[in-house]
Amino acid sequence: MYNSILHTLQSQQGAIIKATEQHISISLLSLLIAMLIAIPLAILLKDHHKIAEACLQVAGIIQTIPSLAILGLLIPIVGIGTVPAVIALVLYAIMPIFQNTYAGLTEIAPNLEEAATAFGLTKWKKLQRLELPLAMPMILSGIRISLVMIIGTATLAALIGGGGLGTFILTGIQSNNNTYVIIGAILSAILAFFFSWLLKFISTNTRRMRIGLIAILVMVCGFGGYKGYQAIRPAPTKVVIAGKMGSEPDILIHMYKDLIQQEDLRAEVTLKPNFAG
């Protein structure tokens, strides 16, 4: 088994790197979107407890829906590929970030709030100088939980053509190849452990937290945004479709060609009919 894993890592090095990049890009893009939704929403609702509780209930209900069911519901609406995978991951990631941000902002000691008001700080200045710095450890904890969950769940993107490390797991299951399953699972676990450790490391020190937050934002916005956009809007590719001998396979490959060219007029589709087998 050990030799088989080493051989696969060497022979499939390019595919593994590509799948890892896809996995990270999908995860970071999903995290970025979830943060842009959850953190501002928690800030807006920190003084509206009933609405915030209702939002938490809705987010909790979404968390109980199986991921495969969400993907199945999204396919008829947005099709297959990266888009439904990102939407599903965002839905799962919102609750921990929103819950922790809201808790961090609402559990600040009242005497500190009163002191800030007595100094004449506006709501924005109070948020900027008092509330967000005090709530930041809780916010980072929510982001860490969401990111680990996203990285683990992103393996399901392979089921709908979204790419990522799940392609190795899926290929291994279909071909009864335990080596592929182990490689996909171990790499996913390593990514989850690394990003969890990174966020925990920067949250233990104020200076480290500031530098780390800037680095994470740059990484998420740059790598996640650019790679995620590439995954959602891939460059035109050449497609080769092979079919067995006979009239029915010949009809099928021509149908596939028409369907592909309807979706992407620039796609170059090459047909290879009359394959034996």
Briefly describe each language-model feature range:
Residues M1-L29:
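Periplasmic/extracellular loop-to-transmembrane helix junction in inner-membrane transport proteins
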Residues A15-I26, I75-P96:
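Loop-to-helix entry region at the N-terminal start of transmembrane alpha-helices
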Residues L41-L74, Q99-A103, E107:
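Cytoplasmic-entry segments and transmembrane alpha-helices of multi-pass inner-membrane transporters
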Residues L91, W124-L156:
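Transmembrane alpha-helices
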Residues N100-I139:
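Short cytoplasmic-facing helical segments at TM-TM junctions of multi-pass membrane proteins
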Residues L165-F201:
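Hydrophobic alpha-helical transmembrane segments of polytopic membrane proteins
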Residues R208-Q230:
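Internal/C-terminal transmembrane anchor helices
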Residues A235-E248, Y256, L265-L271:
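Short, well-ordered beta-strand elements
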